[in-house]
Amino acid sequence: DILLADFGISLSYSALSSILKNAGFESPKKKKIRHRTHRRKRKPHPGQFIQIDATPYEWFGDRVKYTLHGAIDDATGQVVGLFLTQNECLYGYLETMHQCCMDFGIPQTVYSDNHTIFRSPKTGKLTVDELIAGKTIHLTQFGRSMHELGIDLIFAKTPQAKGRIERLWATLQSRLPVEFAKRGIKTLSEANRFLETEYRKLFNQKFSVTPEAEPIFVPLSKGIDLDSILCVKHTRKTDAAGTFSFKNRCFQILD
């Protein structure tokens, strides 16, 4: 791709591989004996099923690992969000979903692993008072955000169940470091700007497929304040004096 785009040289993969091998360059990817597995059929509608995950990698080629958060549409293979942070975190996932909702719309379902960012360890452990109050499940901050947007959040039981996004990581790990190096990108802010404004579009043009049916992403209505949903919220009670505590600090509500 780079030879064609930057130098106008068109070579087949096998020809290029042979040239590099004869010059003493071996592929960094270890070849493994692969057992054939049955790939799940794609969902028909774009927006019906979004896989979300994160992967640590040496994206800048400096032996320091950063974590790339991403989301991919099952029907088209389009990357709907990418965001790079130091470690896997809620912020990275919320930014990824912000891109998805702004650029494509609100999806029907988000499919994740069982990380505590997505699934509370207290799931299924409601107290009697919580049951009496009508609470049915413990939600994480991410889960609460999805609930407010009307998105169903379901969890994968095994890494193999997230095959589509696992294959995305393999592709990005072989391509993104080269793209960063070409452009002299060495910081998180530079990388995230490139990912959101340029790379997602380039990637989707090359790798996305035509869906079987019409998109069912729900467009954002004018009344939705996305920043007030994709955020962290805490509930506190005030005392008779109109004060409440948060993280060992006391706050006074003014009239």
Report each predicted region and the residues it spans.
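Short, charged, surface-exposed loops that flank catalytic or proteolytic processing sites
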Residues: 53, 179-195
